[in-house]
């Protein structure tokens, strides 16, 4: 386990000197441990490139396994802590930055001491499940889970158009809660980038309606999208549920409404706090349902 940690340190630090400093050991000691690791595995893990030690293809192939071993060791240590204390420690939840700021953080605040202490790990939309191989105890994902994880559907969060109450779009709607996509596309839009699931929902809906995007800017930070809308610089299309000082509209075209972003909670089967995580996921689903009313 220690040698796996040393190999990862070298891979992530780039040089033996930097890895040794990171690990708090001397460079000769690290070099000896790495050579011993090679001998134990009977594999060539390192090659010289001038004065630099670089990883071979065999070493790089071992890195995912090393990461899993260290993550499992950390989880085992935390499980022991739980058994000693009799209660779950702080649990780590991986999710996209938007999900964290608009849903998870408000949920943590509202739930208070009724749930175990939760902390968040920001991750990208399409790599969220990878966090379960690392430090995350639970993930909130906008993409479907695989069969290898335990999961609970949380519902769908709608993509809506948001403007300040004084915006011409809000004034002309006269209290209506919907806006035609064709009319919406006459405005400058502020959209999430194509690295987000919500942008895929937007593009698919507009394309299916036979329309195309006009002037727009892209940003993956929800606070900035809200700021652009409040400043009257653009109409924000986003999954924020209840942004202050903005009014929202459901987007329609040809009698069809734009879809939402489906969310799912997932965790590893057999997790030491699996029962608590399932209960948290259920409460989180109820929180989302209540926020959408």
Model segments located where?
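Acidic, Gly/Pro-rich loop/turn segments at junctions of secondary structure
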Residues: 122-186, 241-242, 246
């Amino acid at each position: 386990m220690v040698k796996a940690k040393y190999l990862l340190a070298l891979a992530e630090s780039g040089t033996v000197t930097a890895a040794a400093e990171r690990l708090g050991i001397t460079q000769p000691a690290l070099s000896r441990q790495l050579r011993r690791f090679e001998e134990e595995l009977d594999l060539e893990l390192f090659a010289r490139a001038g004065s630099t030690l670089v990883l071979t293809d065999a070493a790089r192939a071992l890195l995912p396994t090393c990461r899993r071993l260290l993550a499992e060791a950390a989880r085992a240590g935390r499980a022991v802590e739980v058994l000693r204390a009799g209660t779950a420690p702080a649990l780590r939840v991986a999710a996209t930055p938007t999900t964290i700021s608009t849903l998870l953080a408000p949920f943590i605040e509202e739930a208070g001491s009724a749930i175990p202490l939760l902390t968040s790990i920001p991750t990208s939309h399409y790599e969220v499940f990878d966090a379960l191989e690392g430090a995350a105890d639970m993930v909130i994902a906008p993409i479907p889970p695989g069969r290898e994880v335990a999961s609970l559907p949380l519902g769908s969060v709608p993509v809506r158009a948001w403007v300040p109450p004084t915006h011409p779009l809000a004034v002309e709607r006269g209290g209506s809660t919907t806006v035609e996509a064709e009319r919406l596309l006459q405005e400058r839009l502020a959209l999430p980038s194509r690295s987000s699931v919500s942008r895929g929902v937007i593009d698919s809906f507009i394309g299916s309606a036979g329309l195309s995007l006009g002037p727009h800017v892209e940003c993956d930070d929800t606070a900035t999208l809200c700021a652009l809308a409040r400043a009257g610089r653009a109409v924000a299309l986003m999954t924020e549920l209840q942004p202050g000082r903005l009014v929202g509209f459901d987007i329609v075209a040809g009698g069809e409404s734009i879809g939402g972003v489906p969310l799912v909670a997932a965790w590893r089967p057999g997790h030491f706090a699996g029962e608590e995580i399932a209960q948290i996921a259920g409460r989180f689903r109820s929180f989302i349902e209540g926020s959408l009313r």
